[in-house]
């Protein structure tokens, strides 16, 4: 039995100024009243990711996309990634297990889920991209990091011998840990070269529809975060599609732009590509059987089925 219908219309009600973060509302906001008159129940404003779908999003105009227009920090990270030997490549269905290793902790979905998801769409409608690390460049980088830290460590040992204190001891211990990490990187790089293995460190699934693309999900190996794979991945994706598509959907941001926001890093990353920021009308439920809807909501059954722990709290009375 259908208890209710959920909608999440792609109707932008405001554009948000990139600098001031002030909202400029348009006439679409009146649609809220029409929906209410029709019996739709508005869910509480989704400032972060409390609801099933994000209420705020960045839309990138691909025709205007250029490295020079990006945030300075974003440009620097992209250029560093290029200099560190990262490679961007289009992959096939058979490489989905590689991507899955980078995204399996983001959502409680199995590899089979993504494989079936991939098969649902026409082959021309969905793409898989991967970022790999050149093993020779990785070896050079690992050796450089190790040698630099070894030099620092020797200096810390000399200073510690002259005068011991807690601060110097902590610095030495931190340096020891870094040395161990860099040594492991070095050994890993040497083993990869011996086995002629490619090191994949990031990837994304992209859906194409009409004049736009949507990055469905992306991820990267945290062990290689210093190589900035996520920055290069998104930059190359936008470049890849800019000739044939007009817009790129950034797949959601939060409406809280304060540094204290736990999602501040995510916002900063996505907004560094200079998309236009929009607030959308949000989610609405249309109860078909109001009594059953309220009963299921009160008992938490809707939250369980929709996998939303705080659903009961997000509905306005």
Question: How should these model regions be labeled?
Answer:
Residues 77, 237, 266:
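Aromatic/hydrophobic pocket-lining residues that form π-stacking "cages" and hydrophobic walls in ligand
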Residues 2-18, 241-254:
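Conserved GNAT acetyl-CoA-binding A-motif
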Residues 219-228, 254-261:
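Short, contiguous acidic/charged loop-to-helix segments that flank catalytic cores in large enzymes
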Residues 14, 137-138, 257:
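Flexible, glycine-rich phosphate/dinucleotide-binding loops
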Residues 18-29, 35-65, 247-317:
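Active-site/acyl-donor-binding loops of N-acyltransferases
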